[in-house]
């Protein structure tokens, strides 16, 4: 719950959940799963931008923008704050947006060096090296209905002088991503490198490379 002291109609309510389960497959081979969801309501709301990963590092040779400016936001909602809904690999930030989101992340984690050694190693680097395969699925939306008219990410707006044309893009609220990557602890930082493909409306999108620093999940 949040409220500005100087504003009467600034109440914001946020409810969310983050549930994780780690299943041992064989020795150090792990199947990790996460379900996260959140909703905000009240006169003022929190907008969630879905897409990308936490602490995504912008690379000088990358030509993919981190935030998709072409996906519109509902101008009729009073958004007081913003947050990222991650992980949704295969996309830039803002592939979907709204005051609600839900997503599932599923990963197979293989600490390859430690697995074949059969015991923990003295080297933090060798001990932490992992290969991963992952699949993400999720959606972000406004209102009660993910397919409702409150979702402006479903609109495409064309402007030609004084003429403005809005077309229903027929986008499905659900997006998915899959791929693989590597993890390692280097100089005290846990580094993640992922290569992912997004699936939007049944189409597989061009791959996106992510370099990030995060221990979460």
Each language-model region and where it sits:
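C-terminal outer-membrane beta-barrel translocator/porin domains of Gram-negative envelope proteins
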Residues: 1-128, 133, 141-144, 155-164
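One face of beta-strands
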Residues: 17, 129, 176-180, 191
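Membrane-spanning beta-strand positions in outer-membrane beta-barrel proteins
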Residues: 30, 190-192
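Short basic (Lys/Arg) and small-residue
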Residues: 136
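Short small-residue beta-strand/loop micro-motif enriched in glycine and branched aliphatics
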Residues: 143, 192-194
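A short alpha/beta connector and helix-capping loop motif
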Residues: 144-180
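Outer-membrane beta-barrel "beta-signal"
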Residues: 184-186, 206-217
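A short, acidic, flexible beta-alpha connecting loop/helix-capping segment that sits on the rim
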Residues: 196-201
């Amino acid at each position: 719950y949040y409220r500005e002291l100087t504003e009467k109609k600034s109440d914001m309510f946020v409810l969310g959940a983050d549930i994780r389960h780690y299943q041992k497959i064989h020795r150090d081979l792990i199947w990790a799963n996460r379900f996260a969801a959140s909703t905000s309501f009240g006169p003022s709301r929190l907008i969630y931008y879905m897409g990308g990963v936490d602490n995504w590092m912008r690379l000088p040779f990358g030509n993919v923008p981190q935030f998709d400016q072409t996906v519109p936001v509902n101008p009729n909602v009073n958004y007081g704050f913003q947050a990222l809904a991650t992980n949704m690999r295969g996309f830039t930030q803002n592939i979907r947006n709204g005051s609600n989101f839900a997503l599932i992340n599923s990963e197979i984690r293989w600490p390859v060096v430690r697995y074949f050694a059969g015991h923990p190693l003295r080297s933090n680097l060798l001990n932490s090296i992992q290969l991963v395969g992952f699949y993400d699925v999720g959606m972000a939306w406004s209102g009660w209905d993910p397919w409702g008219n409150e979702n402006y990410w479903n609109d495409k707006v064309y402007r030609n002088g004084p003429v403005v044309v809005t077309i229903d893009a027929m986008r499905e609220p659900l997006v998915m991503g899959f791929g693989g990557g590597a993890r390692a602890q280097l100089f005290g930082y846990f580094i993640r490198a992922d290569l992912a493909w997004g699936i939007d409306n049944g189409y597989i999108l061009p791959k996106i490379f992510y370099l990030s620093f995060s221990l979460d999940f």
